[in-house]
Amino acid sequence: MDSNTLSSFQDILMRMSKMQLGSSSGDLNGMITQFESLKLYRDSLGEAVMRMGDLHSLQHRNGKWREQLGQKFEEIRWLIEEVRHKLKTTENSFEQITFMQALQLLFEVEQEIRTFSFQLI
């Protein structure tokens, strides 16, 4: 994983965990959980690409990996919409900056996962 992407994930997760958004804190916790899950999935795909021999074991272990890939893209789209919504509704500049960075990170991660998946196909 690119060290900048790793630090971006860690920074955004830390910032989001410090936010107090009132009644929407449950939504924010869900977003944080989704970000963490997405990071782990992206890391595992990246590792599989680095060890191309793992492609066969990945396919044998989980014949539904393409289906899971589709689900991850749905999660990314959901997170993008949630982050956009939060960005539109917040007036706090710290939160706006955090959500703008989160949105940029989601676009980068989506592109990286697409690249990894094409290499695995």
From Swiss-Prot:
Q: Which GO terms describe its cellular component?
A: host cell nucleus; virion component
- Motif Nuclear export signal, per the record, lies over 12-21, 85-94
Source organism, top-level taxon: Viruses
Q: Which GO terms describe its biological process?
A: exit of virus from host cell nucleus through nuclear pore
Q: Where found?
A: Virion; Host nucleus
Q: Which UniProt keywords apply?
A: Host nucleus, Host-virus interaction, Transport, Virion
Does the keyword section mention Transport? yes
Q: Which InterPro entries match?
A: Flu_NS2
Report the Gene3D superfamilies cross-referenced here.
1.10.287.230, S15/NS1, RNA-binding (1.10.287.10)
Instruction: State its role.
Output: Mediates the nuclear export of encapsidated genomic RNAs (ribonucleoproteins, RNPs). Acts as an adapter between viral RNPs complexes and the nuclear export machinery of the cell. Possesses no intrinsic RNA-binding activity, but includes a C-terminal M1-binding domain. This domain is believed to allow recognition of RNPs bound to the protein M1.
Record text on subunit structure and interactions: Interacts with protein M1. May interact with host nucleoporin RAB/HRB and exportin XPO1/CRM1.
What extra comment accompanies this record? Average number present in a viral particle is estimated to be 130-200 molecules.
Stated family = Belongs to the influenza viruses NEP family.
In Swiss-Prot or TrEMBL terms, this protein is called: Nuclear export protein
